[in-house]
């Protein structure tokens, strides 16, 4: 008799998941991709009544739980996802893992190194997963396709990764916790976490040293604990260079929340990703890849509808079969660790 594949097993078993923490809009995209990948959303909870009501409008058929414990005690649920207040995410994840479930959390996953260390202990004790939705790669077709091209050697050996993640602030729409350092962690540990994960992924590095990190509040004195600019320089364990810059200065005139780009330099060429838009307006939509190599003119690839978001199906399969094909736990947590180290470096050198 032919043995079933992991993918077939995943379809047969169909993973049920719940939500704990609805404090950031990212949770809706996370749920959408998990459902599209075959997951079944069965329940949701947030301690804030308004957040629960908003979620119920978007998912009217999903049960709104009366408490966090109701979800943790539900033996039919094997995965919990969430986007709680950033400083609360690790503690929720610890409770989730101790209840025998895997945890899939919005970035940034931590605000302190002590949270990271405690999570590592609980992972070792429980054998559960603490996975992070680094959406600037995992929900970007240009990024996922670029990863394939790099593995094919399109630009030779990767020498440097440069990532830029500007964001639109839209301050009136932000909750109060968003501007409190203890709760959001700082601009590097928040939105720059995407860049650290991509540095590791695109370069193949497994560790790095923080050379320099800086944060500033250039233009928002009304929010004294807020940081509207951050930059970091890294050197990978194998010598690869990394530079990343994030800010909250996307102007209202831009047709996107941010002109997110990355440049990857190799021995035989370079690659540029324009993730959200082509600012020239010449190419509609997002997910643009430009590759320039020795002896060949610049090649343009529109990655839209080319690859989808393959992480999510692979992650569901990993949860069911206890594998690590979507992303290793070591990679996930190393990105978080470097992010926190850089934030700490910047905080100490203000």
What are these model-derived regions, one by one?
Residues 2-3, 9-59:
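N-terminal Rossmann-like dinucleotide-binding module
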Residues 3, 19, 79-81, 237, ...:
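C-terminal helix-rich "cap/oligomerization" subdomain common to oxidoreductases
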Residues 9, 87, 110-171:
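A contiguous active-site-proximal alpha/beta segment in oxidoreductase catalytic domains
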Residues 27, 59-122:
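Beta-loop-alpha module in the N-terminal Rossmann-like domain of NAD(P)-dependent dehydrogenases
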Residues 105-106, 130-132, 273:
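Hydrophobic residues in well-ordered beta-strands that form the structural core
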Residues 133-136, 152-173, 187-195, 208-219, ...:
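NAD(P)-dependent dehydrogenases' Rossmann-like dinucleotide-binding region
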Residues 133-141, 172-208, 224-228, 331-332:
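Mid-domain beta-loop-alpha active-site segment that forms a flexible
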Residues 197-280, 311-322:
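Contiguous beta-strand/loop segments that form the cofactor/metal-binding neighborhood of enzyme cores
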């Amino acid at each position: 008799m032919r043995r079933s594949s992991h993918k077939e097993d995943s379809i047969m078993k169909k993973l049920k998941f719940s939500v704990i923490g609805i404090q950031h809009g990212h949770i809706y995209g996370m749920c959408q991709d998990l459902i599209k990948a075959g997951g079944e959303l069965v329940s949701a909870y947030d301690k804030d009544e308004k957040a629960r009501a908003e979620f119920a409008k978007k998912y009217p058929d999903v049960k709104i739980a009366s408490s966090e414990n109701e979800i943790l005690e539900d033996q039919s649920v094997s995965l919990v996802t969430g986007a709680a207040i950033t400083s609360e995410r690790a503690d929720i994840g610890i409770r989730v893992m101790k209840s025998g479930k895997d945890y899939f959390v919005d970035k940034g996953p931590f605000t302190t190194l002590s949270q990271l260390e405690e999570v590592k202990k609980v992972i070792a004790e429980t054998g559960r997963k603490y996975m992070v939705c680094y959406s600037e790669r995992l929900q970007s077709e240009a990024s996922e396709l670029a990863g394939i091209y790099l593995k094919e050697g399109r630009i030779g050996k990767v020498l440097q990764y440069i990532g830029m993640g500007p964001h639109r602030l839209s301050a009136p729409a932000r909750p109060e916790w968003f501007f409190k350092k203890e709760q959001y962690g700082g601009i590097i540990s928040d939105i720059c976490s995407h860049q650290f994960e991509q540095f590791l992924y695109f370069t193949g590095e497994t560790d790095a040293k923080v050379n320099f990190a800086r944060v500033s509040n250039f233009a928002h004195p009304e929010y004294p604990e807020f940081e509207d600019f951050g930059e970091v320089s890294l050197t990978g364990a194998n010598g690869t260079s990394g530079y990343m810059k994030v800010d909250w200065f996307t102007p209202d005139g831009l047709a996107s929340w941010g002109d997110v780009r990355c440049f990857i330099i190799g021995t035989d060429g370079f690659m540029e990703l324009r993730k959200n838009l082509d600012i020239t307006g010449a190419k509609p939509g997002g997910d643009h890849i430009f590759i320039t190599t020795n002896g060949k003119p610049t090649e343009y690839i529109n990655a839209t509808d080319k690859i989808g978001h393959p992480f999510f199906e692979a992650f569901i399969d990993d949860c069911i079969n206890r594998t690590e094909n979507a992303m290793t736990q070591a990679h996930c947590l190393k990105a978080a660790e470097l992010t926190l180290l850089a934030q700490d470096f910047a905080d100490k050198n203000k």
